[in-house]
């Protein structure tokens, strides 16, 4: 039992079970535990912006030529668009194959629109903002605005510009680059301390959610929820697994490597909670910092694979539930609009419902009021969205690093095979005993 509870993933698993139990048997008390989950997420979000800044800046300075940075970014954008399109198409295909909305026979006029008012207001703002306005929002008002708001895209832009400027100045900036590098190590150590609180955060978040909503809200729309979970599983195993296999790695080994982070996401329904930890682990796995620093933060806004599946699946579900026929032109319009609206969804409050509302508002055939149907199960669906999005970005980072030959395959294989333990507490224990963690050059080639 001691060996099971000591690793972080074991503690999170126990907290998850306790949260469910409290939510079922002591719902009133469980709802008072919400601050535990909120506090944990706030601690994590506090560290995200400075970690992204330090990792990206040091990564760019260590990448050598700026052309290489541009090449990595270009490949990332191409990868994101191709994989996102596959995810959107999968959502439509599964909706038509299984018809989760057929037989509900919902009259849109009978639905209560009051619950959707705040979401629709935000959706109109998203819809009205064109490409030019979206690009302008990437530019912060001041150097620190992105840090203060926690806007990852703005922080990323500042980081890239700062890193490029340091790289162009050459040797004279080495002391500053070294200082920022040391800062990143301090931030990651802070993150390691905060992540130890994950069991408390998961306990609070799960207990509150189960206590407030229970499992009853799943009954009416249970098939849609199950279908979405199955869709994400198929996408991860078949699509992402196939892409990762072409790069020479196994999706199942990657999932095992990230099991602690996935359990935290399972409990909090937020991939933000593990962003710093994932960046740290991928770098320790053998991927160059420049690739991790560019792909992961960008992917959090532009590579939302599971979110993309949800957009098209939910849109067709609402059409089926309200007996709204869709022509081929409507499906192509859904695909095209969702390909645009899915970008930059990260950071918008209630982003899934808001972006779905913005998508449906452009498609007159589907009644937007049908969003009320999926509102009650959005939290449950959000768990699979967060898990799928996280795995999608981790796979993207590994694949792009493999394309660029910016991954130490010997080290990566040793880590994924379990031959090299890189979890934070293992390294801390090794340093405490004066033991050096093996470098990539000392590992046997797989």
UniProtKB/Swiss-Prot annotation:
Molecular function in Gene Ontology = fumarate transmembrane transporter activity; malate:proton symporter activity; succinate transmembrane transporter activity
Q: Which domain of life is it from?
A: Bacteria
Q: Which InterPro entries match?
A: C4_dicarb_transport, Na-dicarboxylate_symporter, Na-dicarboxylate_symporter_CS, Na:dicarbo_symporter_sf
Q: Which protein is depicted?
A: C4-dicarboxylate transport protein 2
Please spell out the taxonomic lineage of the organism that makes this protein: Bacteria, Pseudomonadati, Pseudomonadota, Betaproteobacteria, Burkholderiales
- Can you tell me where the transmembrane regions are? 7-26, 46-64, 77-99, 152-171, 192-211, 221-243, 291-313, 318-340, 353-375, 381-403
Family indicated by similarity = Belongs to the dicarboxylate/amino acid:cation symporter (DAACS) (TC 2.A.23) family.
**GO CC list:** plasma membrane
* Organism of provenance: Ralstonia nicotianae (strain ATCC BAA-1114 / GMI1000)
Q: How does it sit in the membrane?
A: Multi-pass membrane protein
Which BP terms in the Gene Ontology apply to this protein? L-aspartate transmembrane transport
Q: Which SUPFAM superfamilies match?
A: Proton glutamate symport protein (SSF118215)
This chain's function reads: Responsible for the transport of dicarboxylates such as succinate, fumarate, and malate from the periplasm across the membrane.
Q: Which Pfam families match?
A: SDF
Keyword terms of this UniProt record: Cell inner membrane, Cell membrane, Membrane, Symport, Transmembrane, Transmembrane helix, Transport
Localization: Cell inner membrane
């Amino acid at each position: 039992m001691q060996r099971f509870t000591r690793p972080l993933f074991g503690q999170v698993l126990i907290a998850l079970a306790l949260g469910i139990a409290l939510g079922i048997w002591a719902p009133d008390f469980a709802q008072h535990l919400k601050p535990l989950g909120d506090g944990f997420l706030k601690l994590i979000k506090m560290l995200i912006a400075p970690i992204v800044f330090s990792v990206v800046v040091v990564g760019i300075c260590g990448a050598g030529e700026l052309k290489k940075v541009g090449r990595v970014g270009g490949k990332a954008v191409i990868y994101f668009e191709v994989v996102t399109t596959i995810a959107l198409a999968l959502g439509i295909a599964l909706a038509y194959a299984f018809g989760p909305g057929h037989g509900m026979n919902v009259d849109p006029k009978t639905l209560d629109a009051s619950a959707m008012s705040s979401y629709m207001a935000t959706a109109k703002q998203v819809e009205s903002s064109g490409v030019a306005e979206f690009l302008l929002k990437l530019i912060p008002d001041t150097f620190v605005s992105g840090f203060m708001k926690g806007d990852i895209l703005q922080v990323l832009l500042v980081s890239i510009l700062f890193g490029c400027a340091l790289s162009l100045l050459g040797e004279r900036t080495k002391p500053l680059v070294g200082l920022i590098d040391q800062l990143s190590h301090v931030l990651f150590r802070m993150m390691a301390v905060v992540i130890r609180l994950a069991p408390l955060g998961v306990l609070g978040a799960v207990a509150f959610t189960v206590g407030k909503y229970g499992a009853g809200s799943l009954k009416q729309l249970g098939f849609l929820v199950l279908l979405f979970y199955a869709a994400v599983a198929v996408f991860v195993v078949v699509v992402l697994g196939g892409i990762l296999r072409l790069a020479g790695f196994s999706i199942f080994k990657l999932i095992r490597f990230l099991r602690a982070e996935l359990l935290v996401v399972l409990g909090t329904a937020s991939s933000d909670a593990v962003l710093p930890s994932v960046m740290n682990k991928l770098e320790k796995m053998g991927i160059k910092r420049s690739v991790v620093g560019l792909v992961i933060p960008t992917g959090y806004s532009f590579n939302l694979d599971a979110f993309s599946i949800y957009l098209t699946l939910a849109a067709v579900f609402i059409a089926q539930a309200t007996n709204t026929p869709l022509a081929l032109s409507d499906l192509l319009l859904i695909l095209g609009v969702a390909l645009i609206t899915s970008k930059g969804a990260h950071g918008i409050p209630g982003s899934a419902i808001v972006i779905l509302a913005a998508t449906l508002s452009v498609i007159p055939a589907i009644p937007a009021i049908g969003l009320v149907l999926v509102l009650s199960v959005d939290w449950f669906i959000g768990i699979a969205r967060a898990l799928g999005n996280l795995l999608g970005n981790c796979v993207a980072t590994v694949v792009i690093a493999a394309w660029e030959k910016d991954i130490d395959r010997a080290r990566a294989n040793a880590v994924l095979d379990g031959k090299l333990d890189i979890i934070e507490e293992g390294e801390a224990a090794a340093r405490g005993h004066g033991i050096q963690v093996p470098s990539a050059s000392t590992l046997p080639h797989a």
